[in-house]
Amino acid sequence: MAQEQAIDLDKLVSDKIEKRVAEVGLCLENKGLGDDEISRLAEMGILTEVTNLDLGENKISDQGLSVLCKSPFIKNLKVLNLKSNNITEAGARSIAQADNLSNLEQLILKFNRIGEQGAVYLAQSETLVKVTTLDLFRNRIGEIGAKAIKTSKVFRGVSRLRLD
């Protein structure tokens, strides 16, 4: 049985951070990151520079997402991509209640499992007011979740919306 190789998160972050004029992107898509790595990432001060964080196609669950959402270093995030992870309604609730995500403009959660209640949590958020792009494709949000998103006062400014 092969041992799973430990991820050198510091090296991965330094290799993958991309600085452009007025924005800094960190693409950690499909790197096998789980909750332990996301918890360590949440403690990295370099995140204060990051405006675009791509964590798609990893093994992040609600637990890791909760830690990330509480990080004081994510206040400058404008784009958060969490597609294809293991996020449920509890993770959606963490995002909805995260004061540190008040500058978020794009939230990509496609191919997760937030369900109806997760969509309702997002729709009732008091901090996601700057979101203009919201992608909840393949999250089983159903009619109740879709209605909550479409009628949400928080998401009035959304110009790009993708639901089930």
Question: Where are the regions that the model predicts?
Answer:
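Ankyrin-repeat helical core positions
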Residues: 42-43, 69, 96, 123
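Alpha-helical adaptor scaffolds
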Residues: 54-103, 108
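Compact recognition or signaling/catalytic modules
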Residues: 26, 31, 99-107, 113-117, ...
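Conserved hydrophobic beta-strand positions in leucine-rich repeat
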Residues: 24-28, 51-55, 77-82, 104-109, ...
